[in-house]
UniProtKB/Swiss-Prot annotation:
Primary enzyme class: ligase
EC numbers on record: 6.3.5.2
Upper lineage: Archaea, Thermoproteota, Thermoprotei, Sulfolobales, Sulfolobaceae
Catalytic residues as annotated in Swiss-Prot or TrEMBL: 79 (nucleophile), 166, 168
Quaternary data: Heterodimer composed of a glutamine amidotransferase subunit (A) and a GMP-binding subunit (B).
Molecular function, one GO term: GMP synthase (glutamine-hydrolyzing) activity
Domain of life per record: Archaea
Keyword Zinc-finger appears in the UniProt entry: no
Glutamine amidotransferase type-1 domain residues: 2-188
Record organism: Saccharolobus solfataricus (strain ATCC 35092 / DSM 1617 / JCM 11322 / P2) (Sulfolobus solfataricus)
Function: Catalyzes the synthesis of GMP from XMP.
SUPFAM superfamilies associated with the record: Class I glutamine amidotransferase-like
CDD domains tied to this protein: GATase1_GMP_Synthase (cd01742)
Protein name per Swiss-Prot or TrEMBL: GMP synthase [glutamine-hydrolyzing] subunit A
Length: 188
């Protein structure tokens, strides 16, 4: 299986590579200016974290809006990638009233896909100034925290996912399982 990782300069991206490789998948880093055709070789795509604000700096994300709209493969957005997916597909993203940094407890409401087998609460690593306040039409909220209503989301066909937190960071409990569950969706 081949995974594309769209890279926005996030500080934890090497950990995404490490986790996906550990789980036995091939992964390739893709700069966001590549034509959408070059991403059609991947079985799934992960949109990484990064320092940008999607509502103010979308141009810095290159062709990523086209990737989200045109690729017909499973997708996972992490932090900035989560916000990008929501924004491009019609959700609402804004500056967080209470930015989250460090360990945060989330409440899981729906665990049937990327959060499969998880308990109702999970400690996760956060690092964000912006947040998704309303997911796109056709998406459901999988998890929330005291400060961010949309900590995880999925579309109705369980093929596009977003998580506000960083599953790649060791401080996130069971983070490797989120990648494992996502790769399971990619293999279907």
């Amino acid at each position: 299986m081949k995974v594309g990782l769209v890279y926005y300069g996030g500080q934890y991206n090497h950990l995404i590579l490490k986790n996906v490789k550990y789980l036995g998948a091939d992964i390739e880093v893709i700069p966001p200016h590549k034509p959408v055709e070059e991403l059609k070789k991947f079985d799934c795509v992960i949109f990484s974290g990064g320092p940008y604000s999607v509502s103010e700096e979308i141009q810095k994300m290159g062709n990523s809006p086209l990737y989200i709209k045109e690729l017909k493969v499973p997708m996972l957005g992490i932090c900035l990638g989560h916000q990008l997916i929501a924004y491009v597909l019609g959700g609402v993203v804004r500056r967080a009233l209470n930015p989250e940094y460090g360990l945060t407890r989330i409440n899981i409401f729906d665990e049937d896909t990327i959060l499969k087998g998880f308990s109702q609460q999970l400690n996760v690593w956060e690092s964000h100034n912006d947040e998704v306040v309303e997911p796109p039409s056709g998406f459901r909220v999988l998890a929330s925290s005291a400060n961010a209503r949309v900590q995880a989301m999925a579309n109705s066909s369980n093929s596009i996912f977003g998580v506000q937190f960083h599953p790649e960071v060791k401080h996130t409990e069971r983070g490797i399982e989120i990648f494992k569950n996502f790769l399971g969706v990619c293999r279907k």
